Design a protein with these regions (language model features):
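Active-site PLP attachment segment
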Residues: 161-198
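Generic enzyme active-site microenvironment
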Residues: 146
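Walker B catalytic acidic pair
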Residues: 149
Length: 198
C-alpha cells in the first residue's frame, strides 16, 4: 500500500465521514493508526513546539499525552455555561488569548457525541465557533480546527449528525478543517487501528 494509504480506503473514509454532507472545497485523506493516529499526525504537523492546543475542559486524556510527547501542551476552555449549553464566551476568550501568544492555533473539538459528556454542538454553536475562528483568520492567524468524530455514529441519524460539516465550505484559506476519522467505535474495529486524517 502507498504510505498515505490505499486510494479505495481513503475514498471510503471520506465517504463515511461526510455521508452526503461533504462541504465544497479541496478534500484529501491519509490513512492513520486509528483516530488516535489522526490526532497525533495533526499535532505533529500543525503545532509548533512550545505552542498550546485548545480543547474543552472535559477531554480524552490521550490529547494531553500526544501533545506532551510532541513538545506542546493542552489548554482548555470551560465547555458548559451555567445553563449547561456550549460556553461560547469561554471558547472565544480562550481562542483570543492563545492567538495573542501564537501565530497558529490547533483547536480540537470532540463532537458529535463528545466523550465523556455525550454533548453535540448545535448548528448555532458551530456558527459561533466559525465566527470566532474567522475573526482570528482576518488578523492573519492560522487556525486548524480538528473535529474528533470518534463517536459520531452514536449521536443520531447519520445525515443529521453530519449537517454541520457543510458549514466548512468557503472558509478563509488560513483556516484548515481536519477530521479525525476512526473505525474503532461504530465498526468495532478497535484492535485493527483503522483511521484517517481528512
Amino acid at each position: 500500500a502507498p504510505i498515505s494509504g490505499l486510494p479505495e480506503y481513503l475514498e471510503a473514509a471520506i465517504d463515511i465521514t461526510f455521508a452526503g454532507k461533504r462541504p465544497a472545497g479541496y478534500l484529501a485523506a491519509v490513512a492513520t493508526a486509528g483516530g488516535t493516529g489522526a490526532l497525533r499526525i495533526a499535532v505533529d504537523d500543525y503545532v509548533e513546539r512550545g505552542d498550546q492546543v485548545l480543547t474543552s475542559d472535559w477531554f480524552w486524556g490521550t490529547y494531553n499525552i500526544i501533545c506532551q510527547e510532541l513538545g506542546s501542551s493542552v489548554t482548555t476552555f470551560t465547555l458548559f455555561d451555567e445553563a449547561n449549553n456550549f460556553n461560547h464566551t469561554a471558547f472565544s476568550e480562550a481562542v483570543d488569548a492563545l492567538c495573542k501568544k501564537q501565530d497558529s492555533l490547533l483547536i480540537i473539538l470532540n463532537t458529535p457525541a463528545h466523550n465523556p459528556t455525550g454533548y453535540s454542538l448545535s448548528a448555532e454553536d458551530w456558527d459561533h465557533v466559525l465566527d470566532t475562528v474567522k475573526a482570528q483568520a482576518k488578523t492573519g492567524k492560522k487556525i486548524q480546527l480538528l473535529v474528533d468524530i470518534a463517536y459520531i455514529d452514536f449521536a443520531g441519524e447519520k445525515h443529521a449528525t453530519r449537517a454541520f460539516m457543510q458549514k466548512f465550505a468557503g472558509l478563509p484559506e488560513n483556516i484548515l478543517t481536519l477530521f479525525a476519522f476512526s473505525m474503532s467505535k461504530a465498526y468495532t474495529f478497535y484492535g485493527q487501528r483503522c483511521g484517517a486524517l481528512i
